[in-house]
């Protein structure tokens, strides 16, 4: 029998992307609740319990409710794309390239928390340096990022695209999360293995999909004052053999006049760059990804495949 997949919240931005990715798969059976019944709690519970894997594409509180509907019904495995369980010790963190053995943890888990889009890029840059001992745990990490507006869901999409919307946003780029209390920070700190709360400054650009995440560092404050080549080598070794995460060669990065946030829009990969000047003792680590690809729906499908042994 084909494994049954239920996307709870398939009409939202992330859910629609996952549904599209699964539409042509003949090795799965996607079961869907009628749209008119999606607020029927009892019927939702029936669909959740009928699934081999339930992918939750819901706000945090709704995701917690969905999980509660499966209490005592352990045959359904869960992938939660919300923030609700990303730092919960009982949930496997769904970043397959995080560390050695992470793929296996995801494959064997019943509960998988899909990473956030921004943390995916930031952790991809920070975690290898922490694991290699180059980045001190107490380093004051700063993360600057820009995302396509689809990351804000249907409401922000409407505000950016519909000029007749009462809250239409004319800005081409805007900062948010100004009090430095963004909900992604605990996730970034925990899975980045950081002792100090990182400063996270996100922004949104007037483009639908794409993302750039930057982590600038002082080489002199890293263990052994490493060269750019050493930092690059650590990233390259960490992601060796991975088909989704690519570490761009130093010589290629050195020739780039710019990095385009939309380069990977519509794709599930992620590119990592090491920029900097040895003389100044500074390095800028950059992650490029699609906020709806490796940053959301693409990662959910990757995790689903691992859980199904594919």
From Swiss-Prot:
Q: Which residues cross the membrane?
A: none
Listed name of the protein = N-acetyl-gamma-glutamyl-phosphate reductase
Subcellular locations according to the entry: Cytoplasm
Q: Which GO terms describe its cellular component?
A: cytoplasm
The protein's annotated pathway: Amino-acid biosynthesis; L-arginine biosynthesis; N(2)-acetyl-L-ornithine from L-glutamate: step 3/4
GO BP field = L-arginine biosynthetic process
| Record organism | Brucella canis (strain ATCC 23365 / NCTC 10854 / RM-666)
Name of the gene encoding the protein in the UniProt record: argC
Q: What class of enzyme is it?
A: oxidoreductase
The Swiss-Prot or TrEMBL record describes its family as follows:
Belongs to the NAGSA dehydrogenase family. Type 2 subfamily.
Enzyme Commission number: 1.2.1.38
